[in-house]
């Protein structure tokens, strides 16, 4: 993943990613909105120009390598503290490259490998998050982190049958620091 602040640096960015096709995302986008697959350099430039023309608040744009073998599939891991409490595979239902459930994708429970679990916890820690949704895909090079969400949705509970709210509450209870109260009466 690389960041772009303007459309003039596209050549350098594409070189860092190994060329096209690339995924271009508005950093502030959610639910698969503001995400485009640019299959050529010309298309990437056009998308970036359009994003920056409508991007008055200066939000960054992210560019990511398009991993063909993912075939519209990614994995969401729900991390609480130092463990993954639920995980699901998300698959697009049509030819869309986005597997986001809000774009019509379907989810199924999935078991992660030890390597994947460790990577997800490490990704959440790198972002200084104790509760996070880590999105990644399996590739020929191993698991690749796509993004780390600071406020992941709870739809994963329905899909996996796993309770994620309780581990969050338990984590907070274990880690909440108690501060001594100062008695204001008679002070």
Question: Where do the PLM segments sit?
Answer:
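Phosphate-binding site of ATP-dependent enzymes
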Residues: 31-123, 127
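A short, polar/charged loop-to-alpha-helix boundary motif
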Residues: 94-102, 154-163
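Generic beta-strand structural signal
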Residues: 3, 79-80, 138
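A long amphipathic alpha-helix within ATP-dependent nucleotide-binding catalytic cores
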Residues: 96-145, 166-185
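A short beta-strand motif that forms the metal-chelation/ATP-contact edge
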Residues: 77-79, 142-156
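Protein kinase-like catalytic core scaffold
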Residues: 22, 62, 86, 132, ...
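Short strand-connecting beta-turns/loops that link adjacent beta-strands
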Residues: 29, 82, 139-142
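A conserved helix-loop-beta module that forms one wall/lid of the active-site cleft
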Residues: 1-33
